[in-house]
Every structure is written in structure tokens, then in C-alpha cells.
Amino acid sequence: MGLLSILRKLKSTPDQEVRILLLGLDNGGKTTLLKQLASEDITHITPTQGFNIKSVQSQGFKLNVWDIGGQRKIRPYWRNYFENTDVLIYVIDSADRKRFEETGQELAELLDEEKLSGVPVLVFANKQDLLTAAPASEIAEGLNLHTIRDRVWQIQSCSALTGEGVQDGMNWVCKSVNAKRK
């Protein structure tokens, strides 16, 4: 067996671990999203007081997803989880327009963090099942996502409740990790 075939085999092993940081304001749907990814019951979800970790298999990767609470008093502790992050997933409640400015400020601060420099970002425009939800394009414009030049990014409409759009977002995550590791 040649070196190339050994490398190919290593590349296709399902145990490539990916560290994903799942952040966003409280009540954005982070935990619901995580439970949806893990195919768990989403009927009884309470605010996350610390963090949840789940491992999910996807496209030959073991995605270790760290879901950190989004309450204002918890946000200063987010930086304790930045180390070795492969992908940042930022969840936004698309129906809570009153908090768009606050969520934009938090995202901007995250993008300025040195330990997250160059880390791909997926923004989930969540709660698209609600009639009052802003479309992903409007959110992208409001957050000035088009000005991000130091990393790859994607905005994905989704509903963590129904699961719609969630897999599309995770497919992008896996593609980004693959591209980064080549």
C-alpha cells in the first residue's frame, strides 16, 4: 500500500473530529438546533445555564458541538470556549427584530476575537417557520455580512423546530472544514 492510498484512507475515516462552537443570544434556538441535529426530543427545552456538548456524525466527520448559553450574564464566558474552534455557528432569532442590533454587536465582537481569526462562520437565520421572521437576505444586509473578508461565511435560513434548512447549513459546515483541511 502506497503513501497516497494510506493518506486517502486516513482522510476517509469517519473519526475526523471537528469542534463547533454554537453561539447566539438567549432564546435564539441554539439548544433546539443542537437537539434537532442529534435527532433528540425538542418538546421540553429550558434556557442553557452553562453549556451542552453533543457529538453528531455527518459526512465522515464527528462534529463535537458546544452549545453555550446566550444570556447576557453568560456571554463574557464565551471566550473560554474559543480555543481550537474549527467552525463558529451563530444562531439568530429571525423573528425578534428588536434584538437585531444587539445580536449584530455580539457577532461583530466574536469576529474580532483573535482566537476565532479565520474560523468559518455559519449564521443560522432561525425561526423561519414564524410569519414575523425576517428573510436571511435582510438579516445578512443588516449584519453587514458582505463586509467579512477574513474568513468564509454563509447565512442559512432555517427552523430548528421543523428541521428545515438545518441539514443544508451542516452540509456547508462539512464542506468548509474539508476545504480548510486540504
Curated annotation (Swiss-Prot):
<keyword id="KW-0966">Cell projection</keyword>
<protein>
    <recommendedName>
        <fullName>ADP-ribosylation factor-like protein 3</fullName>
    </recommendedName>
</protein>
<feature type="binding site">
    <location>
        <begin position="126"/>
        <end position="129"/>
    </location>
    <ligand>
        <name>GTP</name>
    </ligand>
</feature>
<comment type="function">
    <text>Small GTP-binding protein which cycles between an inactive GDP-bound and an active GTP-bound form, and the rate of cycling is regulated by guanine nucleotide exchange factors (GEF) and GTPase-activating proteins (GAP). Required for normal cytokinesis and cilia signaling. Required for targeting proteins to the ciliary membrane by releasing myristoylated protein from unc119 cargo adapters into the cilium.</text>
</comment>
<keyword id="KW-0333">Golgi apparatus</keyword>
<dbReference type="Pfam" id="PF00025">
    <property type="entry name" value="Arf"/>
</dbReference>
<keyword id="KW-0653">Protein transport</keyword>
<dbReference type="InterPro" id="IPR027417">
    <property type="entry name" value="P-loop_NTPase"/>
</dbReference>
<dbReference type="GO" id="GO:0005634">
    <property type="term" value="C:nucleus"/>
</dbReference>
<dbReference type="GO" id="GO:0005881">
    <property type="term" value="C:cytoplasmic microtubule"/>
</dbReference>
<dbReference type="InterPro" id="IPR005225">
    <property type="entry name" value="Small_GTP-bd"/>
</dbReference>
<dbReference type="GO" id="GO:0005929">
    <property type="term" value="C:cilium"/>
</dbReference>
<dbReference type="GO" id="GO:0032391">
    <property type="term" value="C:photoreceptor connecting cilium"/>
</dbReference>
<feature type="binding site">
    <location>
        <begin position="67"/>
        <end position="71"/>
    </location>
    <ligand>
        <name>GTP</name>
    </ligand>
</feature>
<keyword id="KW-0963">Cytoplasm</keyword>
<dbReference type="InterPro" id="IPR044612">
    <property type="entry name" value="ARL2/3"/>
</dbReference>
<dbReference type="GO" id="GO:0060271">
    <property type="term" value="P:cilium assembly"/>
</dbReference>
<comment type="similarity">
    <text>Belongs to the small GTPase superfamily. Arf family.</text>
</comment>
<dbReference type="GO" id="GO:0005737">
    <property type="term" value="C:cytoplasm"/>
</dbReference>
<dbReference type="InterPro" id="IPR006689">
    <property type="entry name" value="Small_GTPase_ARF/SAR"/>
</dbReference>
<dbReference type="GO" id="GO:0015630">
    <property type="term" value="C:microtubule cytoskeleton"/>
</dbReference>
<keyword id="KW-0547">Nucleotide-binding</keyword>
<dbReference type="GO" id="GO:0015031">
    <property type="term" value="P:protein transport"/>
</dbReference>
<dbReference type="GO" id="GO:0005794">
    <property type="term" value="C:Golgi apparatus"/>
</dbReference>
<dbReference type="GO" id="GO:0008017">
    <property type="term" value="F:microtubule binding"/>
</dbReference>
<keyword id="KW-0131">Cell cycle</keyword>
<dbReference type="GO" id="GO:0030496">
    <property type="term" value="C:midbody"/>
</dbReference>
<dbReference type="GO" id="GO:0003924">
    <property type="term" value="F:GTPase activity"/>
</dbReference>
<keyword id="KW-0206">Cytoskeleton</keyword>
<keyword id="KW-0519">Myristate</keyword>
<keyword id="KW-0132">Cell division</keyword>
<dbReference type="GO" id="GO:0000281">
    <property type="term" value="P:mitotic cytokinesis"/>
</dbReference>
<feature type="binding site">
    <location>
        <begin position="24"/>
        <end position="31"/>
    </location>
    <ligand>
        <name>GTP</name>
    </ligand>
</feature>
<dbReference type="GO" id="GO:0005876">
    <property type="term" value="C:spindle microtubule"/>
</dbReference>
<keyword id="KW-0539">Nucleus</keyword>
<keyword id="KW-0472">Membrane</keyword>
<dbReference type="GO" id="GO:0000139">
    <property type="term" value="C:Golgi membrane"/>
</dbReference>
<keyword id="KW-0342">GTP-binding</keyword>
<dbReference type="GO" id="GO:0005525">
    <property type="term" value="F:GTP binding"/>
</dbReference>
<keyword id="KW-0449">Lipoprotein</keyword>
<feature type="lipid moiety-binding region" description="N-myristoyl glycine">
    <location>
        <position position="2"/>
    </location>
</feature>
<dbReference type="GO" id="GO:0019003">
    <property type="term" value="F:GDP binding"/>
</dbReference>
